[in-house]
Curated annotation (Swiss-Prot):
<dbReference type="GO" id="GO:0005771">
    <property type="term" value="C:multivesicular body"/>
</dbReference>
<dbReference type="GO" id="GO:0001745">
    <property type="term" value="P:compound eye morphogenesis"/>
</dbReference>
<keyword id="KW-0325">Glycoprotein</keyword>
<feature type="transmembrane region" description="Helical; Name=5">
    <location>
        <begin position="345"/>
        <end position="365"/>
    </location>
</feature>
<dbReference type="GO" id="GO:0045211">
    <property type="term" value="C:postsynaptic membrane"/>
</dbReference>
<feature type="topological domain" description="Cytoplasmic">
    <location>
        <begin position="504"/>
        <end position="562"/>
    </location>
</feature>
<protein>
    <recommendedName>
        <fullName>Protein wntless</fullName>
    </recommendedName>
</protein>
<dbReference type="Pfam" id="PF21883">
    <property type="entry name" value="WLS_GOLD"/>
</dbReference>
<keyword id="KW-0628">Postsynaptic cell membrane</keyword>
<feature type="transmembrane region" description="Helical; Name=6">
    <location>
        <begin position="391"/>
        <end position="411"/>
    </location>
</feature>
<dbReference type="GO" id="GO:0050714">
    <property type="term" value="P:positive regulation of protein secretion"/>
</dbReference>
<comment type="subunit">
    <text>Interacts with wg; in the Golgi. Interacts with Vps35, a component of the retromer complex; wls stability is regulated by Vps35.</text>
</comment>
<dbReference type="GO" id="GO:0061357">
    <property type="term" value="P:positive regulation of Wnt protein secretion"/>
</dbReference>
<dbReference type="GO" id="GO:0008587">
    <property type="term" value="P:imaginal disc-derived wing margin morphogenesis"/>
</dbReference>
<comment type="function">
    <text>A segment polarity gene required for wingless (wg)-dependent patterning processes, acting in both wg-sending cells and wg-target cells. In non-neuronal cells wls directs wg secretion. The wls traffic loop encompasses the Golgi, the cell surface, an endocytic compartment and a retrograde route leading back to the Golgi, and involves clathrin-mediated endocytosis and the retromer complex (a conserved protein complex consisting of Vps35 and Vps26). In neuronal cells (the larval motorneuron NMJ), the wg signal moves across the synapse via the release of wls-containing exosome-like vesicles.</text>
</comment>
<keyword id="KW-1133">Transmembrane helix</keyword>
<feature type="topological domain" description="Cytoplasmic">
    <location>
        <begin position="333"/>
        <end position="344"/>
    </location>
</feature>
Amino acid sequence: MSGTILENLSGRKLSILVSSLMLCQVVCFLMGGLFAPVPAGHQTVLGSKCRDVPGRQNDTSFFLYSRGNGACKSLQDIDIEQDELKMANQLVYVFQMPLPRDNNTLQYSRWQQNLIGVLQVDIAYDSASELREPPKELQLTIDTRLAYRNQKDADTDWKLYAHSVEQRYLDCHASHVGRLETLYTCDIIPLFELGALHHNFYLLNLRFPMDTPKQMNLQFGHMHDLTLTAIHQNGGFTQVWLVLKTLLFPFVIGIMMWFWRRVHILQRSPALLEYMLFYLGGALSFLNLPLELLTLGVEMPYMLLLSDVRQGIFYAMLLSFWLVFAGEHMLIQDSPSKSTIRSRYWKHLSAVVVGCISLFVFDICERGVQMRNPFYSIWTTPLGAKVAMSFIVLAGVSAAIYFLFLCFMVWKVFKDIGDKRTSLPSMSQARRLHYEGLIYRFKFLMLATLLCAGLTVAGFIMGQMAEGHWKWNENIEIQLTSAFLTGVYGMWNIYIFALIILYAPSHKQWPTMRHSDETTQSNENIVASAASEEIEFSNLPSDSNPSEISSLTSFTRKVAFD
């Protein structure tokens, strides 16, 4: 039996391979740490207050803007305070993005990929009012209009991107009690999310219509200030990220072709673990495919959803592989028959599939709708926010439970191997040294698997927290550095690359040696014969199994059988 490359590769060659892969891992960390900026940046834009033009309130082709030729005149707070109705139904809050810097006009780049807007609302009540605390879940109706223009367009050439009338709920607290009015600061609310940043300039017009019969926007006094935080992916980070993807993609494709060719050379059908390795490589290749390069030429508002789907497929395949990988090395099995997904792993994998489908449905409910209406958010209603938060907490808890279960499976594998090592002293020294080396290599690989799983779960939880950070308004100190992101991404590729190489079938054949010859060898030749001794178990039931890929598995199953 030839076994795998992990079992037959010499110690020197294995050391060179591991050292090379570790060097690649360091390079991935350094790419993020030295060459990439922070993954995301943001700008805080204070809304300019402009007087609406009578008769144009319902004209979605009309926009007010605060900079450039034909800009509206900003109103002062004193002008609004002196008006008896606080200029109700006459105000338009204008946000023009991006802001200039040092008198230089900045523009968005397609490398920045996406744009998220969250709104900070400050409201005011007359101090003469008996109201001291606004009611919780204060409903706010907003007429939102988002427009765009490009670098070569005129200052007046704004085009409608999206229009919607949205409801948001405010949770406010008093921040300043004055003689004339009391100011209240409200929690930030999600406003919009663009899956593609295809244009150079964006303009946001917000109106707060008041209607007595409909009881619209009558629960609070008047708007005091609006602050928009626009969050975007940094273009420099995107460039480093795509360079990493572009470099890794052909290597993974090449190693998959090499692996599958070696499997099909053998006179047997592929084993379950070999199928899982090939599928895992396919999921990683789909994730590595630098589709984001298409957004530089084509507007793809579905790119965020597509990225989530690709990452979800990879997570599902990776989590499933780890369960099968550990399970295939739990070497005391109820039946010596060939392992299949349906026979051994359907309970474990069904939980992974259900969890991934749940997250996919949750993602479709938000980002699927946002492709048509970027102002939609599941976080807007109190019930929706609780459901979304529950999904995130449940996903994090599930990931932690999965990691603990995987640790338990690996511990059982180690325990099984430890129990089987009691049979090693009865073997010849050459055979014992060979199997001790296999056990050491296997344990090292399993510990690397646990490390990879731990970092993956940590990255998943931190990613979910970062996504919800601006939405549930918690002061969570998170530092998702570029080095961590590129390092973990590189780790996935290097880990899977190593598994495909090490678990590829080895074509090295062990020359036959009669057992009687072993007893006549001198002590000086025993260790040297380890490289040429056939590992042969004539009474082992699994020897007749054409899908067996590991002589370590054969060894432990034989001891269990005996």
